[in-house]
């Protein structure tokens, strides 16, 4: 499941977790924090480097240059600090059912600058070139309503990969204690 070119994995872990009531990145998943689970997943999928978006010194996290701008702001900060990166695979911290095999579908050889799964913003693959960086800069300078992963994917004409029903089940994420409890109950250690 390796890409011909090296790639960098990015875990988006800078959110406030306000609906969860506690830091989602540190919730225990099969014996380790969710953040570590997602880092391990990216390494398993073949990432040469894995970086964390968010003010997390204990994980060498990259703090947002402009706080409170959501996932797009975190991604912009990572890209600004990863000048040598040519390809990023971006995952949220709260999607522990993702598999390396599914991420591999994003990494299939492609000429697309942006690749994501149908009906999903994340995970996504970005092949960084001047046009991707410019699109990100324009969105970050624009109105707050345009600062979203959806807007970035739209501006890059993101290619959508189809998934099976069983693969779709891997996109479960958790934003509330009830969702987390259900996920733990359905996926015991």
From Swiss-Prot:
GO terms of molecular function: GTP binding; metal ion binding; molybdenum cofactor guanylyltransferase activity
Substrates-to-products reaction catalysed: Mo-molybdopterin + GTP + H(+) = Mo-molybdopterin guanine dinucleotide + diphosphate
An annotated GO cellular component: cytoplasm
Entry superkingdom: Bacteria
Predominant location category: cytoplasm
Top-level class of the enzyme under EC nomenclature: transferase
Necessary cofactors: Mg(2+)
EC number(s) given by UniProt: 2.7.7.77
Cross-referenced InterPro entries: MobA-like_NTP_Trfase, Molybde_CF_guanTrfase, Nucleotide-diphossugar_trans
Transmembrane segments: none
Positions with a binding annotation for Mg(2+): 94
Record-listed GTP binding positions: 12-14, 24, 68, 94
Record keywords: Cytoplasm, GTP-binding, Magnesium, Metal-binding, Molybdenum cofactor biosynthesis, Nucleotide-binding, Transferase
Residue ranges the record marks as coiled coil: none
Location(s), subcellular: Cytoplasm
A biological process term (GO) from this entry: bis(molybdopterin guanine dinucleotide)molybdenum biosynthetic process
Pfam families, per database record: NTP_transf_3
Record's keyword annotation contains Manganese: no
Free-text domain note: The N-terminal domain determines nucleotide recognition and specific binding, while the C-terminal domain determines the specific binding to the target protein.
Role, per record: Transfers a GMP moiety from GTP to Mo-molybdopterin (Mo-MPT) cofactor (Moco or molybdenum cofactor) to form Mo-molybdopterin guanine dinucleotide (Mo-MGD) cofactor.
Membership in a protein family: Belongs to the MobA family.
Subunit-structure text: Monomer.
Designated name of the protein: Molybdenum cofactor guanylyltransferase
């Amino acid at each position: 499941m390796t890409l011909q070119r090296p790639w960098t994995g990015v875990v988006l872990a800078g959110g406030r977790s306000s609906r969860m009531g506690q830091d989602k990145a540190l919730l225990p998943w099969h014996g380790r924090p969710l953040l570590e689970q997602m880092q391990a997943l990216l390494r398993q999928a073949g990432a040469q480097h894995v970086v964390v978006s968010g003010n997390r010194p204990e994980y060498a996290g990259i703090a947002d240059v402009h706080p409170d701008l959501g996932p797009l702001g975190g991604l912009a900060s990572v890209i600004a600090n990863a000048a040598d990166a040519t390809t990023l695979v971006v995952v949220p911290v709260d999607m522990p059912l993702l598999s390396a095999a599914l991420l591999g579908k994003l990494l299939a050889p492609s000429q697309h600058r942006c690749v994501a799964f149908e009906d999903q913003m994340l995970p996504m693959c970005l092949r960084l070139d001047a046009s991707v960086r410019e699109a990100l800069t324009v969105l970050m300078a624009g109105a707050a309503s345009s600062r979203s992963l959806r807007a970035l994917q739209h501006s890059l004409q993101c290619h959508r990969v189809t998934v099976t029903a069983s693969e779709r089940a891997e996109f479960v994420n958790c934003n509330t204690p009830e969702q987390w409890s259900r996920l733990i109950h359905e996926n015991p250690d």
